[in-house]
Amino acid sequence: MLFLVLGKGKTGSLVADVARERGHGVRAMDIDENAGAGALNGPTLSGVDAVIDFTAPEAAVENMRAVLALGGRVVVGTTGWYAHLDAMKSIAELRNGSLLYGTNFSIGVQKLFRLTAEVARLDDYQFSITETHHTTKLDAPSGTAITLKEIIQSVRPGIEVPITSHRKGDAKGEHIVTAKSEHDVLELRHDAHSRRAFAIGAVRGAEWLAHQAPGVWDFREVFDRL
């Protein structure tokens, strides 16, 4: 397969490396090489099985709009753009494009989501979330923390779930879900030691997306089909 990776930062570079290791062809563009998604045209996307985006929220929206409008396939690991999700779904449906997005492409975090849904069923517990990331992460709270909160509230409607965010050094990503009762405390924790986990999930997602009919999927829905 041939993948076009958008973003040459730490995670984007790892995505390109992982894709090559898995035997795929890779082309890569940095944000400056694709200002306003201007480089995402028919000739650029010709022969590309999927685009993988790890850029920034505003750039990701422009990139998705361009790729989906051409009926292309795009995997988006960038977070912080979800206010535009309905618009992206509409473009994908209109132009027969394909979108796979997720607040976190780590398989371990996907398991954390499922465990959180199970723990949220406990009665008489109060829940809170703490997340820590590197100082260059643009969105706070993280998309993963927001997803964890949404999972808890889907099981326990109306419950308050405070999120505490920290930005420290080059932290790869730590999420802690705390369930506290009058009698005890239960914690679920995922601590990323390397961005490679996100890269592997994104590439596996792109491999999966390349074989699907047009549509829009959340990584949470498909990760165990990869």
Residue ranges and their predicted role:
Residues 41-50, 54-78, 86-88, 93:
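Rossmann-fold NAD(P) dinucleotide-binding segment
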Residues 101-109, 134-141:
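Short, surface-exposed loop/turn motifs that are enriched in glycine and acidic residues
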Residues 6, 54-55, 77-78, 102, ...:
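Structural motif
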Residues 2-6, 10-45, 58, 123-226:
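C-terminal substrate-binding/catalytic lobe of Rossmann-fold NAD(P)-dependent oxidoreductases
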Residues 26, 74-75, 98-99:
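Hydrophobic beta-strand scaffold residues
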Residues 65, 78-100, 107-110, 114-119:
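Rossmann-fold NAD(P)-binding glycine/threonine-rich loop
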